[in-house]
Design a protein with these regions (language model features):
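Conserved Lys-Pro-Asp/Glu-containing loop-to-beta segment of HAD-superfamily phosphomonoesterases
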Residues: 153-182
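Short amphipathic alpha-helix with an adjacent loop that forms part of the alpha/beta core around
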Residues: 220-226
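Short, acidic loop-to-helix structural element flanking the phosphoryl-transfer center
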Residues: 4, 9, 84-114
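Short acidic-hydrophobic, aromatic-tinged amphipathic segments that line or gate anion-handling sites
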Residues: 140, 211-219
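Histidine/lysine/aspartate-rich catalytic loop segments that bind and position anionic ligands
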Residues: 128-159, 165
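Active-site neighborhood of HAD-like aspartate-dependent phosphohydrolases
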Residues: 2-47, 53, 60-61
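Acidic, Mg2+-coordinating phosphoryl-transfer loop and its flanking beta/alpha structural elements
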Residues: 174-214
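Substrate-recognition element of Asp-dependent hydrolases with the DxDx(T/V) motif
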Residues: 98-128, 140-146
């Protein structure tokens, strides 16, 4: 059988790394600082969503007028907080099972990119902390779209722009940890690998019908998957 090259699209938070609640807290701090109103962001406020949509939703709940200037000031402050505080925090950690899976995918000759709700600058800070940023030639980020369902299509387009390589949706694999990740893969006709880090989310993800669903990525058989 001839080798079939796939494009694996990796999510960051909850998949490759755990931010340890640090980035969520810093984003809330940035919104609070620039609006003057105290904001708390819980797990369900951020998991599976883009940075921009998280902030928009928070501002809507506060009845704040959303302007491009306000969003820019919030994110610029957020970036500065991430640079100064995330990089030195001991709370974030890497999920070794996913890094091992990334190794397996790349060693098998497949292509990889990022598919994340993070702003590009934030994604870079998070991954450089664990020396993972250089593993990816490109990604699709929150600046590109606030609609996660659109991200696989943008990744396909970017693969051509960067590598001059074409992948059909059936030869793309979304790797994530949330219902939104599963939906983005399945509704675009991609294969979907979901690692469930929150046991209470299992049933909701399982209903989506991903190709693989488990609590630890060590058990994935790459040959069976692709």
């Amino acid at each position: 059988m001839s080798f079939r090259k796939y494009l694996f699209l990796f999510d960051i938070d909850g998949t490759l790394i755990s931010p340890g609640g640090v980035s969520r807290g810093l984003l809330a701090k940035a919104v609070t600082e620039k609006t003057g109103e105290k904001v708390h962001l819980g797990y369900n406020d951020v998991a599976g969503y883009t940075d921009r949509s998280i902030v928009r939703n928070a501002l809507l709940k506060m009845n704040q007028t959303i302007t491009a200037d306000l969003l820019d000031r919030i994110f610029q402050y957020y970036f500065s907080l991430m640079k100064s505080e995330f990089m030195v925090s001991k709370d974030p950690f890497v999920y070794q099972d996913c890094v091992d899976f990334l190794d397996k995918v790349q060693n098998a000759g497949h292509a990889v990119c990022l598919l994340t709700g993070n702003m590009k600058a934030v994604a870079r800070i998070k991954l450089e902390k664990f020396d993972l940023w250089k593993r990816f030639d490109f990604g699709v980020f929150a600046e590109d779209t606030e609609d996660k369902l659109a991200m696989p299509r943008l990744a396909k387009k970017r693969a051509w722009e960067v590598w001059k390589d074409t992948f059909t949706e059936s030869h793309m694999v979304v790797v994530g940890d949330t219902v939104q990740d599963a939906e983005a893969g399945i509704k675009n006709g991609c294969k979907t690998v979901i690692v469930c880090r929150k046991r209470e989310k299992w049933d909701d993800i399982n209903k989506m019908g991903p190709e693989w669903l488990g609590h630890c990525m060590d058990t994935i058989d790459l040959v069976d998957l692709v």
